[in-house]
């Protein structure tokens, strides 16, 4: 079930705008859910779930300058999407996905993290501290204290923009993409900033700040307080990336035609993913991987 309302226009043969609002209800979505082991199977995949997506798309384009020898244009698009789980399976309102840090709950967006909240390292003894479900500090880690933390795996905002420039035979184009509001668990830090693995894995320079004596203010706890998969590993993975950069030169037709063999020729350079701006410390904010 989909409702779309949009408008598309071009003004002065130079400005173009497309705007669309949508409301999509998707039913009978494929979903894997657990079965009793007495059935002989651990899980089944069936058409049982429902989800609603609401948002808008906007696309803009501007021909800034256009003459016989010179042209310059810019374009961009922006999407906002808010999803909501409206139905699970067997009448359940919530279901935790094992070992993922994610929980599905009717009325919540798909992809909101469900973790125990890390509260820092106690400078008195170097032990990790967490918040329990009631917001009280504790040094005892329990997955029963996991809550929705208001951070999503999937970015609600995404888009891109680009520019094209041409002067005589020279052409330059650049395309960028971005995502805003997405978070990722930096699994690498569990190994590279963890005293437990200091003897077997490469460690980051952050390990030089590990707690050693009372009064030390740090986020690397003593080896006596094991690290856990909690919110301190969640990082803002919003990013802007230059996806493509193309620089080219089209040889003058008069020069090419003198060869008597070819009618046109173009020399160009293409670069991909040349620049990424992000606060995420992992390998790639677009790839959820432990590599």
Label the model's feature ranges.
Residues 3-9, 15-23, 56-64, 72-80, ...:
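Membrane-embedded beta-strands that build the outer-membrane beta-barrel scaffold
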Residues 179-272:
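Extracytoplasmic gating/loop element in the C-terminal half of outer-membrane beta-barrel translocons
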Residues 33-43, 136-145, 217-231, 287-291:
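Flexible, solvent-exposed coil segments and beta strand-coil junctions
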Residues 29-33, 37, 80-98, 181-209, ...:
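Outer-membrane beta-barrel and related beta-rich outer-membrane complex signature
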Residues 1, 48-54, 108-110, 151-156, ...:
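Short sequence motifs at beta-strands and strand-loop junctions characteristic
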Residues 14, 65-72, 85-90, 253-267:
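Short loop/turn motifs that connect adjacent beta-strands in outer-membrane beta-barrel proteins
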Residues 46, 63-153, 272, 279:
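Conserved small-residue
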Residues 1, 20-51:
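Solvent-exposed loop/turn elements at secondary-structure boundaries
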């Amino acid at each position: 079930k989909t409702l779309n309302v949009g408008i598309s226009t071009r003004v002065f043969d130079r400005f173009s705008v497309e705007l669309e609002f949508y409301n999509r209800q998707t039913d009978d979505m494929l979903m894997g859910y657990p079965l009793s082991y007495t059935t002989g199977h651990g899980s089944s995949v069936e058409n049982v779930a429902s989800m609603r997506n609401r948002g808008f798309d906007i696309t803009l384009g501007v021909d800034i300058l256009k003459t016989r020898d010179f042209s310059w244009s810019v374009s961009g698009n922006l999407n906002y999407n808010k999803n909501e789980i409206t139905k699970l399976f067997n009448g359940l309102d919530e279901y935790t996905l094992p070992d993922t840090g994610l929980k599905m709950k009717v009325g919540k967006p798909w992809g909101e993290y469900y973790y125990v909240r890390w509260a820092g390292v106690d400078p008195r003894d170097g032990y990790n501290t967490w918040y329990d479900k009631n917001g009280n500090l504790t040094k005892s880690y329990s997955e029963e204290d996991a809550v929705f933390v208001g951070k999503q795996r999937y970015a609600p905002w995404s888009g891109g923009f680009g520019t094209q420039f041409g002067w005589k035979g020279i052409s330059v184009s650049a395309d960028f993409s971005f995502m805003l509001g997405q978070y990722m668990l930096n699994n690498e830090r569990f190994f590279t900033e963890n005293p437990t693995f200091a003897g077997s894995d490469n460690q980051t320079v952050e390990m030089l700040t590990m707690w050693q004596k009372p009064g030390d203010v740090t986020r690397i706890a003593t080896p006596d307080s094991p690290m856990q998969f909690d919110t301190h590993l969640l990082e803002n993975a919003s990013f802007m990336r230059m996806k493509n950069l193309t620089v080219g030169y089209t040889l003058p037709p008069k020069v090419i035609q003198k060869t008597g063999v070819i009618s046109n020729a173009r020399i160009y350079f293409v670069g991909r993913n040349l620049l990424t701006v992000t606060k995420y410390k992992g390998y790639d904010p677009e790839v959820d991987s432990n590599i």
